[in-house]
């Protein structure tokens, strides 16, 4: 059986990878290996590895890589630790293919070590554009280190080919998020309010604002202006999800928590998980922020 090693580092990529992992797990031709790292293993971000275990996936390796700093220097040190950790994990697991999604720095490190170890990489959701963030450079770099590409649209397929990848290995398979929407039984309004321990209003917004990693100085100003605008919506209830583990992420989190403490019509969660997040999307009037 071919060993497919899936790497997940955050609530975001796991929500999309889950159904691919299910199919690999249930295959009689493939064997699932799972490396969990990054924000999944941090209490600050909700220990979301527990959701993976609740979904009955066996975790082969837990790689703790996040240093207690959200400065650019701290992120660089986390990347260094990630490179060392992934080198050992991939050497021990000896997978036939490493399967990754997206553009975060921990995924960049996983793919870098796989490339050096001559392990083929399959990359999901390449060819996309994220203006104002280092994700853009990370994603295209991951593309160049990968051998198989599974993209969401023909536009993204063309972009991956423009980067020099062979068309025979670039597949337009659609968005994985659609699979999740079709397979999940979303919560009704009453059930959602119960699991959130928060009452929805007549008007509701779901808010996520990540650090703008290519413009740190304006990022905090942008969030400050966003919170000021939201504070003017007296008749609107606000549900915040917290930022990623990026440079200045903790500063952004502190600003949001301070805002929520002073507003009875708002709440904040380190992680909602896929079911609660998509259920929120179903029932709110709008989604606000800069999350992709």
Short names for language-model regions:
Residues 3, 96-97, 204, 286:
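Structural motif
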Residues 31-75:
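Conserved nucleotide-sugar phosphate-binding/catalytic loop shared by glycosyltransferases and other
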